[in-house]
Amino acid sequence: MTSAARPRVRTRALTGTLAAFSLSFGMIMISGATPASAATWPTPTNSQPVSSTISVSGTRDGGMVRYYGSGALAGDDQEEGQDPIFKLANGATLKNVIIGKPGADGIHCEGNCTLQNVWWEDVGEDAATFRGGSTYTVTGGGAKKAADKVFQHNGPGTLNISNFAVSEFKTLYRSCGDCSTQYTRKVNLNNIEVTGTGSTARLVGINVNRGDVATLRKITILNDSGRKVVPCQKYNNNDSAGTGPDSTNCLYSSSDITYR
């Protein structure tokens, strides 16, 4: 599920026109929407190859351009140690971006960061990795075709994910199970649309032996009559330690999960 730590502290374990902007949200809005049907994915305004990682400080508005890896960033599988398309400095915001195929290692947040209305069309190694800081925010957007994880949490702190759509994935969020330096981590999921495929998938994977806490609210799961999507998977590092809600680590109730 995760992989051994590396010196780069990496383990395997988001303005176009108003019309384009509205289309990109579909059912997943920055605030206030309740997912009811599969999200409408945005149409890119342009496509741009990226052969070396783009560093972001402050705010970068991608204008709904599709960025995809080329050259050294042409990897899109689960090979470890890939570089990201974007690397965000502490406090940076990336918004209105589509990451296409090849996706390399998506986005790295080196500190606190905000990903707003970012869409991953075909997740590479991971969609985003949170490496340092205390608070990370993912709001709006979506991800699909993740052979393993969407969001990898290696650093400390809390990741807040809201108004997000995910499909064709194995794990939406994973707290690192084998990083060389470990932390107690928190993740909050709110207003998440999940499309099942009939295969086993997990919304969150947390390390209960480290005191991790996952809070799930307003989760809508589509196309999962067999209940293959596990809301909260517990681990002792990399060893499975059960599933389901409790009063300590996996904070949700049946009323927080809607199946359609």
Language-model region placement:
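General secondary-structure propensity
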Residues: 24-25, 135
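Beta-strand repeat architectures
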Residues: 87, 91-92, 108-112
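N-terminal export and membrane-targeting signals
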Residues: 1-21
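Parallel beta-helix/beta-solenoid
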Residues: 91-99, 116-118
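Eukaryote-specific detector of the first structured module of a protein
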Residues: 60, 79-89
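C-terminal region of N-terminal signal peptides and the immediate post-cleavage residues
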Residues: 25-40
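Extracellular beta-rich repeat passengers
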Residues: 39-54, 59, 64-78, 107-124, ...
